[in-house]
Structures are given as structure tokens and as C-alpha cells.
């Protein structure tokens, strides 16, 4: 028996914000389909984030993980197929066909390569030469997920094959993830599936780099110095007393995507964990619909968030375990060989900066105590996510506990 390896990589680079703008709309039926799919992707992302049970930063791409597992679902059968379908919140076989078509339309609609916003979703299928991969699977993967299909020789050239995959990921993420695979693949590998999501967005109006200065960030376990960007902006905002938190939205140029930050009040860490458990897709959508513009004094870390983890144990906890079991995995719609999944590796990198990242940071004190009572100051752990505003798909979802300072 031979192993499948699943890899998901996601990167985001952004410069900081200005006034609100509004996304273009889709035809009603298409928008409804994408909203339904967006909720499914959101729920899976929440399942994974909560299942990871990490104490530090956690940043995942629900879109990337969903796309990867969706491709795998097309090649599965029996119990493995049922588990993947339930994990992706797909109700039945008929809904599965609609699911793949909706995913195809979603990727076509949200992908962008403009001067202000780039969103690139790439799927790579790397197959062992002569491994008996079923044509119908690769055909559907190309059709619905725009997958690039390549053949490699893992059996005799595992080091070179690993380098080829790393180079593909590096190019797809514009150099932000150069070495997703840190060790050569097992020579018995039959199939490697990779999904990457690269997002680079500019805010409508950037922060002034001269207003960036080092300040304290309270992690809950201690205080660290990080560069804090500041400004006064009209942003969409909501106070959430029932969750002991408040939320602000920061849109990107074009209005199709926005970053949301949910900031708990009170104790930094305990409230963050409890808060995430309350945030279903339905709850998030309801809160966003109630947000209203408000002029606020804003402070955000100039930071890098990076996260890399195996998702094998997490997916097992989410009842998607048979694909990892050589005796139980069923991928008979993918290959004529008896194969199983060895691991699912996910890496995410997010960078948050002003638009002019080469500008020198300012020196001097910064006060959030005078002149403006409307303050949204991210100086403690928060939930952060980047969302497609039309479909509701979370491109990235994270728990910010300790920002990595990103300095000029």
C-alpha cells in the first residue's frame, strides 16, 4: 500500500486601512449558492481551529483546507467518502454535485489579479508515474478546482520530487512559503495534493507610517513590545455585550474582501477561547449585518502571523479518521491501488503593514486616552479573519495571541 500526502498553504499580505467601500453583487441565485457554500467552509474552518487546541497563535485558511478535502472527497468511496462529506457539511450525494459546481463558481468569482488586490487559489496534484490514477478523478479535479496535474517519480527521485513541489508552492505563494515540505517524501508516495491561497490586499487609505511606534501588547502571559500602527478612520463597528467583545471591519480596495477583528473585553486569554466557541457562521453573519459606520481611533500591530501544523489528529477528532488508516481508507475513485493519507500539513503566513512598508517608523509616545472616546486598540489577544464579502467565505481565520513584530 502507498501513501497520499495532502498539503495546504495560505498566505496574506496587506497594508492598513481607510474608509468603507462596498462589494459588487452577483446574480441572486448565484450569490445564494455561494453564501450557502461560504457557511459550510466557515463551519469547517471553525471546527479545525477549535480542534487544534493550541495555546499560541493559530492561523488557518478555511478556504484552502476545504478545497483540499473537497478534491479528496471526489476520489473517495464508502466510509471514507461519508466521513469527508459530513466533515465538509455536505448533506447527500445530490448536494455533493452542487457543492463541487458551487466551489468552481466561487473560485472563478473571487480570484483576482489586479493592482490593488490579488487573490490566487491554486491546486496541484502530483502523481507517481504509472500509479493507476483514474482519469475521471483528474478530469473532475481540473474542471471543478482548476487543478494542475503533474507526474513525478517519487519512487526513484523523492528528493527531486519534493523540491519540485516546494518550488510550486513557493511560486504560488509569491515566495512567502518557500519550504512547505522540510523532509524528502517517502519513496512509496503515490499522490500529493496541494492547495495554496495567496492574498495581497491594499487598504483604501493606508496608515501613516510616521504614526507607527512601539507599544506594549499584553499576551496574557506577559507583555511584549510591538510596533503599533494608528489612525482615525470611519469603520464599520459593533459592540457585542452578550459576548463581552467588540468587532471592527477594515475593507480592502474594491470592497470585495475585508479583515475583521473581534476584540474581547477583560482577561486576554480565557475570554478569547470562550469567545471562539460562540462564533458560528450564522452568528458571524448576523453580527456583520448589524455593524454600522463609526469614526474611531484605531491601533493595530504591524505584524506577521505564521502557523504550521499537521491536521491529522484534528481531522481524526472531527470524525474524518478512516482516510489515515491503511486498513480502512477507500480511495477507489482516485486510483486502482490501495492507498491512504499519510498526513495533512497546513501552513499559513499573514503579514499586516502600512501601505508604505519601507517608510521609517516614528519615535515618540502615542496616547489613546485623550480626544476620542471611540477606541479600537488591538493590544491584547483577538480573533482575526479575512472574509469575502459577497459569499461570506473566510479566506483566513486566526487567533492572535502573540504577534511577531514586523519592522521596516
List PLM regions with ranges.
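Detector for small/aliphatic-rich hydrophobic stretches
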Residues: 1-158, 358-360, 404-406
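Non-catalytic, conformational "gating/processing" segments within enzyme and secreted inhibitor domains
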Residues: 55, 91-273, 282, 286-371
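C-terminal soluble interaction/assembly domains
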Residues: 346-408
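Short coil/turn residues that cap or connect secondary-structure elements
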Residues: 72, 76, 129, 173, ...
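Structural recognition of the beta-strand scaffold that forms the well-ordered cores
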Residues: 67-70, 126, 259-261, 385, ...
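A generic structural signal for residues located within well-ordered alpha-helices
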Residues: 63, 188-189, 378
Amino acid at each position: 500500500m502507498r501513501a497520499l500526502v495532502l498539503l495546504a498553504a495560505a498566505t496574506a499580505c496587506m497594508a492598513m486601512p481607510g474608509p468603507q467601500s462596498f462589494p459588487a453583487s452577483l446574480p441572486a441565485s448565484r450569490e445564494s449558492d455561494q453564501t450557502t457554500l461560504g457557511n459550510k467552509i466557515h463551519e469547517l474552518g471553525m471546527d479545525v481551529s477549535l480542534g487544534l487546541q493550541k495555546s499560541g497563535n493559530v492561523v488557518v485558511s478555511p478556504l484552502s483546507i476545504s478545497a483540499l478535502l473537497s478534491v479528496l472527497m471526489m476520489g473517495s468511496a464508502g466510509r471514507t467518502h461519508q466521513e469527508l462529506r459530513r466533515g465538509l457539511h455536505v448533506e447527500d450525494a445530490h448536494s455533493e454535485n452542487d457543492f463541487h459546481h458551487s466551489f468552481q463558481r466561487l473560485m472563478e468569482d473571487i480570484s483576482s489579479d489586479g493592482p490593488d488586490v490579488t487573490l490566487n487559489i491554486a491546486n496541484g496534484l502530483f502523481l507517481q508515474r504509472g500509479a493507476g490514477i483514474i482519469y475521471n478523478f483528474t478530469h473532475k479535479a481540473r474542471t471543478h478546482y482548476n487543478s494542475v496535474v503533474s507526474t513525478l517519480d517519487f519512487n526513484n527521485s523523492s528528493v527531486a520530487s519534493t523540491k519540485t513541489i516546494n518550488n510550486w508552492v513557493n511560486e504560488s505563494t509569491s515566495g512567502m512559503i518557500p519550504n512547505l515540505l522540510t523532509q524528502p517524501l517517502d519513496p512509496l508516495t503515490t499522490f500529493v495534493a496541494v492547495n495554496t491561497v495567496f492574498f495581497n490586499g491594499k487598504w483604501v487609505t493606508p496608515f501613516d507610517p510616521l504614526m507607527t511606534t512601539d507599544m506594549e501588547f499584553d499576551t496574557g502571559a506577559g507583555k511584549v513590545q510591538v510596533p503599533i500602527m494608528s489612525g482615525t478612520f470611519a469603520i464599520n463597528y459593533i459592540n457585542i455585550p452578550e459576548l463581552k467583545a467588540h468587532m471592527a471591519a477594515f475593507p480592502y480596495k474594491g470592497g470585495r474582501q475585508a479583515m475583521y477583528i473581534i476584540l474581547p473585553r477583560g482577561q486576554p486569554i480565557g475570554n478569547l477561547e470562550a469567545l471562539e466557541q460562540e462564533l458560528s457562521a450564522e452568528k458571524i453573519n448576523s453580527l456583520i449585518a448589524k455593524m454600522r459606520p463609526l469614526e474611531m481611533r484605531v491601533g493595530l500591530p504591524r505584524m506577521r502571523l505564521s502557523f504550521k501544523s499537521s491536521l491529522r489528529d484534528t481531522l481524526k477528532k472531527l470524525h474524518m479518521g478512516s482516510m489515515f488508516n491503511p486498513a480502512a481508507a477507500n480511495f477507489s475513485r482516485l486510483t486502482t491501488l490501495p492507498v491512504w493519507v499519510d498526513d495533512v500539513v497546513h501552513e499559513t503566513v499573514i503579514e499586516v503593514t502600512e501601505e508604505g512598508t519601507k517608510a521609517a517608523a516614528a519615535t515618540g509616545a502615542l496616547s489613546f486616552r485623550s480626544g476620542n472616546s471611540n477606541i479600537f486598540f488591538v493590544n491584547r489577544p483577538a480573533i482575526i479573519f479575512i472574509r469575502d464579502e459577497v459569499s461570506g467565505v473566510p479566506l483566513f481565520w486566526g487567533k492572535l495571541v502573540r504577534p511577531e513584530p514586523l519592522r521596516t
